Amino acid sequence: MNPIVKQFKYGQHTVTLETGAIARQATAAVMASMDDTTVFVTVVAKKDVKEGQDFFPLTVNYQERTYAAGKIPGGFFKREGRPSEGETLIARLIDRPIRPLFPEGFFNEIQVVATVVSVNPQISPDLVAMIGASAALTLSGVPFNGPIGAARVGFIDNQFVLNPTMAEQKQSRLDLVVAGTDKAVLMVESEADVLTEEQMLASVVFGHQQQQVVIEAIKEFAKEAGKPRWDWVAPQPNTDLINKVKAIAEARLGDAYRITEKQLRYEQIDAIKADVIAQITAEDEEISEGKIVDIFTALESQIVRGRIIAGEPRIDGRTVDTVRALDICTGVLPRTHGSAIFTRGETQALAVATLGTERDAQIIDELTGERQDHFLFHYNFPPYSVGETGMIGSPKRREIGHGRLAKRGVAAVMPSLAEFPYVVRVVSEITESNGSSSMASVCGASLALMDAGVPIKAAVAGIAMGLVKEEEKFVVLSDILGDEDHLGDMDFKVAGTREGVTALQMDIKIEGITPEIMQIALNQAKSARMHILGVMEQAIPAPRADISDYAPRIYTMKIDPKKIKDVIGKGGATIRSLTEETGTSIDIDDDGTVKIAAVDSNAAKNVMGRIEEIVAEVEAGAIYKGKVTRLADFGAFVAIVGNKEGLVHISQIAEERVEKVSDYLQVGQEVNVKVVEIDRQGRIRLTMKDLAPKQETEINQEDPVEEQE
């Protein structure tokens, strides 16, 4: 085995591509490394097309092996299971830029498998997997119009940073991944701390320029190690069939695409499609329905795109930069902590915010270690939202991806844990959908968070842009419909505040999208975002001053860290009894910060008083109220503050001589006692003699407390 190796510098890192030694039965296999993070990527392509296949069956799998980080998986089975949310998102990140580079009509099945086999905690494997997938596809000989490059761009001290390390990323105001060919950008995925449109565009251009070194290196690698390119030829169009479909459907489809209501339009189009299939198959039974449907869909695209390029009104009658009618309601669910319904045309999101305590944080076990997530965002897309029936179950790749995009849009305005000590979960239920439900989720989430009293830094809105480009002519569309997304050349989603952008996602289906076109799209998106924010601010101008009556209120107090063990008790007995008896939730940090969550403020104050008693220092000479816990021949044991036991010797029970302790005291009896001394071993000697007559001399353990809402 003689592996072929290509090594090159990429920013501050060294990238190595190796092939020829492992997985030699795959169509292509590449071991891609960036410093010590290594991802093994394979491509298998079937030479034959399944009979009746009418779509491109590309599958991308990304999997992380725990051995890559020198770990053994947790759980009962001690092996990796179903893909995590992070693995699913990276699989989508690989898929999105490579899918448009396969030619139209190519229906051979292809599977890309990326396996993380070694990980340097400072180098994220996602970029390595993208580069490895690009290299493997380029070597495989399949009709792939790549290679692509991939770059991560950070923004630190007003400077763009190429492929920042994990440590550098913590200081960055931007996390942007851009992928593209030598000619054009194909995909952008980003999260930003409120940057301007100009800064976002500059970061995309910077990343695309820098990744050219990757593209050139893969081309050189393919010259040495690549397989012969397949002699695949695109199927010739059936002009007779195209003309037949046009003759039957063109005029009727033109009329159907003037119906503004989605369901009525779809019913009309489905009826036309069924009629076309029936007429043509009646004449020639050998013609497959799939071919007829492909031509029918192409005709739809031609009609819609032609009208947009010609400057005619869009499908629903709008101009290119008009946002659909908005309708907003907040506080729609009576017992939730915060809720809102955001409706934009025929797209609607019900967003609900829930406040929880630190113990509700999600523990995420990654290759680089465990971390806690205090802001959770979940997006649900049920089939009824598009008037269909279907399976209801665990979230699919699309739902996970849309949820993460919406979360990215809102994350920049969330308060820190120190400012607002709650774990926050937002759920977006898409109840209607006709384009850009992820951006409706951003708007709905912002409204629900404000309704819940979460002190977000600013309202956030999102908008989806589209593009139709024919040769040199192009039109940028604001607030695209589902059909415009499907039939257009670009899906461009922007979320942000009045001050700037918080998230940008872009998927481009064609080459030739210039920075100028992207700048027009960003400017048009900003105008639409300002319009939406204006309507949102009328509905709820600022976060509510108080949280919901049904949300837990968190009260904080400080104790001596040395006393934490006393509050917890043996085996957690003390803290468990406190929570069970008061109905509160108690969290204690290592620095002695105690956070008590309770819906009832009296319960919180009660438990705080009891904690104060537990941690209180017993003072010699002080008088306490205590409870007799047990009797002995030589005296009685009395529990005082914090259940600390002291001994009242038989000689200290009364002024007169005591013959029998039980004649004076009973278990459970409350008595006043005075601390005589605390010896070196911490034992407490008590007396019931020589007590001051007035109750006011007793130690009061109540201190003022701080409430955080």
Curated annotation (Swiss-Prot):
<dbReference type="InterPro" id="IPR012340">
    <property type="entry name" value="NA-bd_OB-fold"/>
</dbReference>
<dbReference type="Pfam" id="PF00013">
    <property type="entry name" value="KH_1"/>
</dbReference>
<dbReference type="GO" id="GO:0003723">
    <property type="term" value="F:RNA binding"/>
</dbReference>
<dbReference type="InterPro" id="IPR012162">
    <property type="entry name" value="PNPase"/>
</dbReference>
<dbReference type="GO" id="GO:0000175">
    <property type="term" value="F:3'-5'-RNA exonuclease activity"/>
</dbReference>
<feature type="binding site">
    <location>
        <position position="485"/>
    </location>
    <ligand>
        <name>Mg(2+)</name>
    </ligand>
</feature>
<dbReference type="InterPro" id="IPR036612">
    <property type="entry name" value="KH_dom_type_1_sf"/>
</dbReference>
<dbReference type="Pfam" id="PF00575">
    <property type="entry name" value="S1"/>
</dbReference>
<dbReference type="GO" id="GO:0006396">
    <property type="term" value="P:RNA processing"/>
</dbReference>
<comment type="similarity">
    <text>Belongs to the polyribonucleotide nucleotidyltransferase family.</text>
</comment>
<dbReference type="InterPro" id="IPR027408">
    <property type="entry name" value="PNPase/RNase_PH_dom_sf"/>
</dbReference>
<keyword id="KW-0963">Cytoplasm</keyword>
<dbReference type="InterPro" id="IPR001247">
    <property type="entry name" value="ExoRNase_PH_dom1"/>
</dbReference>
<dbReference type="InterPro" id="IPR036345">
    <property type="entry name" value="ExoRNase_PH_dom2_sf"/>
</dbReference>
<keyword id="KW-0808">Transferase</keyword>
<dbReference type="InterPro" id="IPR020568">
    <property type="entry name" value="Ribosomal_Su5_D2-typ_SF"/>
</dbReference>
<dbReference type="InterPro" id="IPR004088">
    <property type="entry name" value="KH_dom_type_1"/>
</dbReference>
<comment type="subunit">
    <text>Component of the RNA degradosome, which is a multiprotein complex involved in RNA processing and mRNA degradation.</text>
</comment>
<dbReference type="GO" id="GO:0000287">
    <property type="term" value="F:magnesium ion binding"/>
</dbReference>
<keyword id="KW-0479">Metal-binding</keyword>
<keyword id="KW-0460">Magnesium</keyword>
<feature type="binding site">
    <location>
        <position position="491"/>
    </location>
    <ligand>
        <name>Mg(2+)</name>
    </ligand>
</feature>
<protein>
    <recommendedName>
        <fullName>Polyribonucleotide nucleotidyltransferase</fullName>
        <ecNumber>2.7.7.8</ecNumber>
    </recommendedName>
</protein>
<keyword id="KW-0548">Nucleotidyltransferase</keyword>
<comment type="function">
    <text>Involved in mRNA degradation. Catalyzes the phosphorolysis of single-stranded polyribonucleotides processively in the 3'- to 5'-direction.</text>
</comment>
<dbReference type="InterPro" id="IPR003029">
    <property type="entry name" value="S1_domain"/>
</dbReference>
<dbReference type="Pfam" id="PF01138">
    <property type="entry name" value="RNase_PH"/>
</dbReference>
<feature type="domain" description="KH">
    <location>
        <begin position="552"/>
        <end position="611"/>
    </location>
</feature>
<dbReference type="GO" id="GO:0004654">
    <property type="term" value="F:polyribonucleotide nucleotidyltransferase activity"/>
</dbReference>
<dbReference type="InterPro" id="IPR015848">
    <property type="entry name" value="PNPase_PH_RNA-bd_bac/org-type"/>
</dbReference>
<dbReference type="GO" id="GO:0006402">
    <property type="term" value="P:mRNA catabolic process"/>
</dbReference>
<dbReference type="GO" id="GO:0005829">
    <property type="term" value="C:cytosol"/>
</dbReference>
<dbReference type="InterPro" id="IPR015847">
    <property type="entry name" value="ExoRNase_PH_dom2"/>
</dbReference>
<dbReference type="Pfam" id="PF03726">
    <property type="entry name" value="PNPase"/>
</dbReference>
<feature type="domain" description="S1 motif">
    <location>
        <begin position="621"/>
        <end position="689"/>
    </location>
</feature>
<dbReference type="InterPro" id="IPR004087">
    <property type="entry name" value="KH_dom"/>
</dbReference>
<dbReference type="Pfam" id="PF03725">
    <property type="entry name" value="RNase_PH_C"/>
</dbReference>
<keyword id="KW-0694">RNA-binding</keyword>
